[in-house]
C-alpha cells in the first residue's frame, strides 16, 4: 500500500478505534495523545450500544468487554421528592474501556500510540501530498492524512478553520472558533459500587431544570448531576473546587436509590465539573485533514450517544480510507481527488444520523430536566408506560441501530444474532 500513513490526533476511545481499524487494514499510523497516559483513571462512565459492541468485537475484544462491562438491565426513575416513576436502558467505566482497547492492540501497534504529544500546528503540504503535525515538544510527524479525534476543544478543528481563513474563505462559511453551545452543566463523580447496589442498575432523579443520573458497573458506579445554566454560552469554563462543592450541596439530598442519597456516595477526589456542549460543525474536512467524534459533533450525555456516534464515524471513515488505498494499488497512494472523495462519502453516510441523534439527545436532556410544562407532562406521564417504551425501542431505536455499518474489510464472527437482522452483516471468516 505504498507509504500511506495516517496521523491520528487524540488517543481516546475514538482514536483507539481508528488505530485498531487501520492496523487491521495494514495501513501505517501514529496516534498523538496530549496526556501523559493513554488511560486516565479519572474518566467518567460510558454506555456502549449494540452496534458499538459489534464493531469492537471485530477487533477480537468481545470477551474482555463482556467481562468488564455490566449490562444496564434495570432502570429506576424518581422525582427529587423520592417518588418511583419506573422507566428503561446498557455500562463501562471509561478508563477500563480505554485500557481494554489499548491493551487489545498488538505490541507493534501499541508502540505507535505516543503520549505527551500536544499538537500545536497542522500544515498541509500540497507539493508533496502530505500533512505535517507539530507538537509542543518540538517533534514533527508527517503523513498522508490526519484524523482529528481530539475532543470538544479540538486543536485539529482549530487548525482546519485557520487554514480555511488563510485560503480566503468567508467567515460565514467557516465554523465559529467555539462552535458548540452550552445550555447545561454537569457534576460527576465515580465511587466503588456499594454492596447494596446491584451491577447493571441505572437510575434518574428528575427535577425542574435539573437531573441526577446513576450508572452502575461491575466494580464502580457513576453519578452525573445536570443543571441548566442561567443563560447559554459558548465560552470554555474551568470550574473550581468551590463551584463543585456548591453544586454538590444543591443535590446532596436527592435520592440515588430507595435507601441512598447523593451525599452518601459522593467522593470529591473522583469528581469533576464541566459545561455540556451541543452542536455539529459545518466543516468536517479540508484537503488531507478530517474530523471525527467530539471534534465535529457534541451531544449532551443523557442518551449516551456521543461515543457511539464517534465509533460510527470511525467505521465509515476507515472503510472509505481502506477502499481508497486498496484502489490506488500497492505501489501508489490515493490522489488528493481520491482523498476528497473518501472524506465526502464519509460525511454523506453520517450527517443525517448525526443530526437526528443531536435532536434526540437534546430532547431527552430537556425531558429529564422538565425544561417546560410540556416536557414535564411527557416525562412524568406520557412516556412512562411500559408499552410506550416498547414502541419507542421497537419502532425508533431498533430500526436505526440495525442499519449501523461495520468494518467491511475485517472478517469476524457475528456476535449478536436476534429476531431482527442487521442490514450490514460482518464479513465472515474464510475457512481454510
Curated annotation (Swiss-Prot):
Glycans are attached at residue 283. GO terms for molecular function: FAD binding; monooxygenase activity. FAD-dependent monooxygenase; part of the gene cluster that mediates the biosynthesis of sordarin and hypoxysordarin, glycoside antibiotics with a unique tetracyclic diterpene aglycone structure. First, the geranylgeranyl diphosphate synthase sdnC constructs GGDP from farnesyl diphosphate and isopentenyl diphosphate. The diterpene cyclase sdnA then catalyzes the cyclization of GGDP to afford cycloaraneosene. Keywords: Antibiotic biosynthesis, FAD, Flavoprotein, Glycoprotein, Oxidoreductase, Signal. Its EC number is 1.-.-.-. InterPro entries: FAD-bd, FAD/NAD-bd_sf, FAD_mOase_fung. Belongs to the paxM FAD-dependent monooxygenase family. Pathway: Antibiotic biosynthesis. GO terms for biological process: antibiotic biosynthetic process. It comes from Sordaria araneosa. Its cofactor is FAD. Gene3D superfamilies: FAD/NAD(P)-binding domain. Residues 1-19 form the signal peptide. It comes from the Eukaryota. FAD binds at residues 33, 47, 94, 294. This is FAD-dependent monooxygenase sdnN. Pfam families: FAD_binding_3.
Amino acid at each position: 500500500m505504498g507509504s500511506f500513513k495516517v496521523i491520528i490526533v487524540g488517543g481516546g476511545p475514538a482514536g483507539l478505534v481508528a488505530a485498531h481499524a487501520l492496523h487491521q487494514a495494514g495501513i501505517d499510523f501514529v496516534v498523538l495523545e496530549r496526556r501523559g497516559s493513554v488511560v486516565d483513571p479519572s474518566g467518567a462512565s460510558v454506555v456502549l450500544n449494540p452496534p458499538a459492541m459489534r464493531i469492537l468485537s471485530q477487533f477480537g475484544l468481545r470477551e474482555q468487554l463482556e467481562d468488564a462491562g455490566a449490562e444496564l438491565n434495570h432502570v429506576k426513575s424518581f422525582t427529587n421528592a423520592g417518588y418511583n416513576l419506573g422507566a428503561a436502558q446498557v455500562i463501562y467505566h471509561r478508563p477500563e474501556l480505554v485500557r481494554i482497547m489499548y491493551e487489545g492492540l498488538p505490541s507493534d501497534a501499541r508502540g505507535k500510540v505516543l503520549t505527551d504529544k500536544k499538537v500545536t500546528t497542522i500544515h498541509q503540504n500540497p507539493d508533496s501530498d502530505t500533512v505535517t503535525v507539530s507538537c509542543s515538544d518540538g517533534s514533527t510527524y508527517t503523513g498522508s492524512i490526519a484524523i482529528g479525534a481530539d475532543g470538544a476543544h479540538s486543536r485539529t478543528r482549530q487548525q482546519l478553520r485557520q487554514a480555511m481563513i488563510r485560503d480566503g474563505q468567508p467567515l460565514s462559511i467557516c465554523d465559529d472558533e467555539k462552535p458548540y453551545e452550552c445550555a447545561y452543566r454537569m457534576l460527576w463523580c465515580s465511587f466503588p459500587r456499594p454492596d447494596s447496589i446491584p451491577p447493571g442498575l441505572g437510575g434518574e432523579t428528575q427535577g425542574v431544570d435539573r437531573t441526577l443520573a446513576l450508572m452502575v458497573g461491575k466494580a464502580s458506579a457513576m453519578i452525573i448531576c445536570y443543571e441548566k445554566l442561567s443563560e447559554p454560552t459558548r465560552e470554555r469554563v474551568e470550574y473550581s473546587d468551590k463551584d463543585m462543592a456548591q453544586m454538590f450541596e444543591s443535590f446532596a439530598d436527592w435520592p440515588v436509590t430507595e435507601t441512598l442519597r447523593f451525599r452518601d456516595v459522593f467522593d470529591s477526589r473522583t469528581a469533576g465539573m464541566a459545561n455540556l456542549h451541543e452542536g455539529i460543525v459545518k466543516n468536517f474536512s479540508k484537503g488531507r485533514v478530517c474530523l471525527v467524534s467530539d471534534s465535529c459533533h457534541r451531544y449532551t450525555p443523557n442518551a449516551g450517544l456521543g461515543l457511539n456516534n464517534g465509533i460510527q464515524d470511525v467505521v465509515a471513515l476507515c472503510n472509505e480510507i481502506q477502499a481508497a488505498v486498496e484502489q490506488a494499488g500497492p505501489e501508489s497512494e490515493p490522489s488528493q481527488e481520491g482523498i476528497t472523495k473518501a472524506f465526502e462519502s464519509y460525511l454523506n453516510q453520517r450527517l443525517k444520523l448525526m443530526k437526528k441523534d443531536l435532536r434526540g439527545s437534546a430532547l431527552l436532556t430537556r425531558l429529564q430536566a422538565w425544561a417546560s410544562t410540556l416536557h414535564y407532562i411527557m416525562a412524568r406521564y406520557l412516556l412512562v408506560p411500559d408499552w410506550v417504551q416498547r414502541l419507542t425501542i421497537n419502532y425508533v431505536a431498533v430500526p436505526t441501530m440495525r442499519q449501523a455499518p461495520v468494518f467491511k474489510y475485517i472478517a469476524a464472527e457475528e456476535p449478536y444474532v436476534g429476531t431482527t437482522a442487521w442490514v450490514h452483516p460482518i464479513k465472515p471468516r474464510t475457512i481454510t
